[in-house]
Amino acid sequence: MLNMTEEHDKALEAPCSPAGTTSSMSHVDSDSDSPLSPAGSEGLGCAPAPAPRPPGAAPLGAKVDAAEVDERFPACIRDAVSQVLKGYDWSLVPMPVRGNGSLKAKPHVKRPMNAFMVWAQAARRKLADQYPHLHNAELSKTLGKLWRLLSENEKRPFVEEAERLRVQHKKDHPDYKYQPRRRKSVKAGQSDSDSGAELSHHAGTQIYKADSGLGGMADGHHHGEHAGQPHGPPTPPTTPKTDLHHGSKQELKHEGRRLVESGRQNIDFSNVDISELSSEVINNMETFDVHEFDQYLPLNGHTAMPADHGPGAGFYSTSYSHSAAGAGGAGQVWTHKSPASASPSSADSGQQRPHIKTEQLSPSHYSDQSHGSPAHSDYGSYSTQACATTASTATAAASFSSSQCDYTDLQSSNYYNPYPGYPSSIYQYPYFHSSRRPYATPILNGLSIPPAHSPTANWDQPVYTTLTRP
């Protein structure tokens, strides 16, 4: 141990010396022939520090350094250094904990190498010398492949060496027990999001767009073609419980949609005529329970709105987009109409001629139209709940064919009667206002209302609605 300290003395300058940490090799060389400073004996300004290494690092490579130091510096410098450092007790120097593992309470014992590691270590050294440019990761991959190709005979020397190492390890550390580091558990959110992604993708790339204020769920198609527009509502991922109930409907629905989607990808809704909706899809519609969706009512008090604005006042103008029915993106889209939108009475007065009414395009229009006409000129894909309603229209009622759709659960005027008295400023999002360029879509061609459920059963005349596009 005494010998070691001698070598340390030569290798290192006293930590108390300010020059020790800062002086570089060039500094040392330039001073190498200067006379010894008297201050050196106090250990304050001893110039010839052989290396700028911190004190704690000395023990690691001391022997090598001692040999190097001997050759690098003239004898007078070496003597001066050893003279200065001789009286210093190196056991007092604090060692950095991470710098030297042996000082830890329990030094880490590595596992003995297995046969592959023996092979890889030897081969890596050899290859790294021959091909220094090889990246270590690539090297490891290649070594692994080679190892698999080796025959038993070729592997034998490595296996034997590994066995020898294991026995030796057991001797050295009789009570050794392998304790692997605990892995951090997979984040809980991760698995959830994966299952969520699965859910949303099995329905034909649906993105449930939840309108924070309006609770409307739109479809991935709308998302796709309006992706360029900065004013889309926020889209938190949702996995509503209704998904379970409507699994079978989804199958039905997406059959149709897939056919159409195989056509072209993007749709321009300004050219869409909803009257092309195929009647067979309408006839396939099934019922679902309106009250199941009450949990999705918006929190901003639309439910409490006075109901005295129109004849169907007792009912909310909820329009269930068919994403609600089938895709489980259950959204009640609350669409409040501006005074221009028709209440049944205004429709009656104009019975003789078809009306054209201008209406706001509300989020539910998005969800239905984008959902319902996800693809293109043939609307065979339109299904469960959409039924040709661009649900935001007050007159969307006319879109129900009187065929086998059973609407007992959709308390009729859910579709028909919005709040005609509400001004357009009711929209929370500025992009629902009609200030954008309008596009006219003749919506309801020959479809009439199911008389049994309609409070306004005398509307037989189809009503055309002009929608304004946000």
Swiss-Prot record:
Which Gene3D superfamilies does the annotation name? High mobility group box domain
Q: Which gene encodes it?
A: SOX8
Q: What UniProt keywords apply to this chain's record, in alphabetical order?
A: DNA-binding, Nucleus, Transcription, Transcription regulation
Q: What is its main location?
A: nucleus
Q: Which CDD domains match?
A: HMG-box_SoxE (cd22031)
| Annotated stretches, region: Disordered | 1-60, 163-257, 327-381
Q: Name one GO biological process term.
A: heart valve development
Question: Main role?
Answer: Transcription factor that may play a role in central nervous system, limb and facial development. May be involved in male sex determination. Binds the consensus motif 5'-[AT][AT]CAA[AT]G-3'.
Which InterPro entries is this protein grouped with? HMG_box_dom (IPR009071), HMG_box_dom_sf (IPR036910), Sox_N (IPR022151), SOX_TF (IPR050917)
Locate the compositionally biased regions of type Basic and acidic residues: 1-12, 163-178, 219-228, 242-257
Query: Disulfide pairs?
Result: none
Name this polypeptide is given? Transcription factor SOX-8
Which residues fall in a compositionally biased region of kind Polar residues? 359-372
- According to the record, the residues making up region (Dimerization (DIM)) are 67-107
